[in-house]
Structure formats: C-alpha cells, structure tokens
Amino acid sequence: MSDWNPSLYLHFAAERSRPAVELLARVSLENIEYIADLGCGPGNSTALLHQRWPAARITGIDSSPAMIAEARSALPDCLFVEADIRNWQPEQALDLIFANASLQWLPDHYELFPHLVSLLSPLGVLAVQMPDNWLEPTHVLMREVAWEQNYPDRGREPLAGVHAYYDILSEAGCEVDIWRTTYYHQMPSHQAIIDWVTATGLRPWLQDLTESEQQHFLTRYHQMLEEQYPLQENGQILLAFPRLFIVARRTE
C-alpha cells in the first residue's frame, strides 16, 4: 500500500482531533507512567496525551513511515515506533492504551481487543474511538462506484457493533463505558468531502488504480455525492460522521 500523506491528513486537523479530545476527557486516570498511542498518525493525538501527562513515557505506534517521521518532528520528547499494532509488544504493562481512529483498519476485533487488554496493567484503561460510517453515503458510494467500474472491494470491514464490543471487553475483564456520537461537519463543497476521505477511507480504493482510473473513479464519486448531500441554505454541506467510543478499565 502506498504510504499515508500527513499533510493531506492534517488538512482537517481540528475535525480529526476533536474526537480524541472528547475520548480523552472520559479517561479518569491521574498519575500514570506508561502510555501507548496506537495508530498515532502525525502525532496530533499523542500531543494531547503529552499535554495531560507530561511526565509519562509515551510511545506512539504507526505503520506509516511518513506519519512516524512527522510525529517525531512535532514531538521530540515522545518515542515513536514504526510497527504493526497487532504485532507490537511493549516492554512493560501499560497504564493507558489510546487508539483514536486506528483500530477500524484492523481485522478480527474478537481477538484484537482481548489482546490489547492483556497489555494493560491492573486498573489500566483501553480508550478507543473508531469511525462508524460504513453505512454512511460517503462509504456506501465508494463501494457502488467500485462495483460500477468493475474494481474489487477494497474497503474496510464494518465494526462489530456496540453489543459485541461490550461483550468482548466484559469477558476480557473490563468495566466498559461505550457510546456513539454523530458529528455534523460543515463542508464548503462536495470536493471538500472528497479531500477529507481521500486521506483515509478512499485510500484503499485508489491505491492500485492508474492516474486516469483514479480520475474516472473520483469524477463518478463526485457526481454521486452531489445526489446524496444537498446544499444548505447558505451553500454549506453537512457531512454526518458517526463515531463509536469505548473506555474499558481492566478490573483484574
């Protein structure tokens, strides 16, 4: 897969950071020592963690060399490791595992989430936020365009669901706080929606296409977005973006 583009990702930095801020606000830990930021990207979520716990040892994990380089440049006081979340092993038990908009890219959450809980110290916390927009027009249309143009399905899997995550984490020995929030982002144009998803959800669909194929895909995608997202009275577009939040505290 082609590498992530930090500049494109940070184009909507405020919108992408807001869920991390709101997730962090629900983590009731005080003096903690070891933190992992899984899927840290360019370090915007890591910066929030460092601001709240400046004395903690924070390790950011990401599989993208470009994202890791950007994060290291922005936060020289934190450790950043290029690794696959599924294979990375900390040197010590973690007081907090923070995963903002990263775990949705990984398969088999029935195994992944108990594994992450096993990395926590007693009373440690797993804090997770995942986009829950698999059924939103932005993502449904990606699949429809790919089908129209005879491209394979390269999208991520849908989330397991609120009840499934509650059971998975309860059985792993956690107290679970889980909620879902829908954000309505004001977009100036349909092209702005494409700019947003090109940095994330559209990447797998476009990565193996030629430049002309990508343009053909995006032209059709733009047409379909216009049909699904009407303009407001002031010309703006409201982009609904549901997100699932989980704060699980280990009790064992």
Curated annotation (Swiss-Prot):
Pfam families recorded: Methyltransf_25
GO biological-process terms attached to the record: methylation
Family (UniProt): Belongs to the methyltransferase superfamily. Tam family.
Organism of derivation: Escherichia coli O45:K1 (strain S88 / ExPEC)
An example Gene Ontology CC term for this record: cytoplasm
Matches recorded under InterPro entries: Methyltransf_25, SAM-dependent_MTases_sf, Trans-aconitate_MeTrfase, Trans_acon_MeTrfase_C
Catalysed reactions, as listed in the record: trans-aconitate + S-adenosyl-L-methionine = (E)-3-(methoxycarbonyl)pent-2-enedioate + S-adenosyl-L-homocysteine
Main location, first listed in the record: cytoplasm
Disulphide bridges, residue numbers: none
Superkingdom per UniProt: Bacteria
Enzyme Commission no: 2.1.1.144
GO MF terms held by the record: trans-aconitate 2-methyltransferase activity
Gene name in the database record: tam
Name of protein: Trans-aconitate 2-methyltransferase
SUPFAM superfamilies in the cross-refs: S-adenosyl-L-methionine-dependent methyltransferases
Protein localization: Cytoplasm
Keywords, sorted A to Z: Cytoplasm, Methyltransferase, S-adenosyl-L-methionine, Transferase
Gene3D superfamilies in the record: S-adenosyl-L-methionine-dependent methyltransferases, Vaccinia Virus protein VP39
Function: Catalyzes the S-adenosylmethionine monomethyl esterification of trans-aconitate.
CDD domains per UniProt: AdoMet_MTases
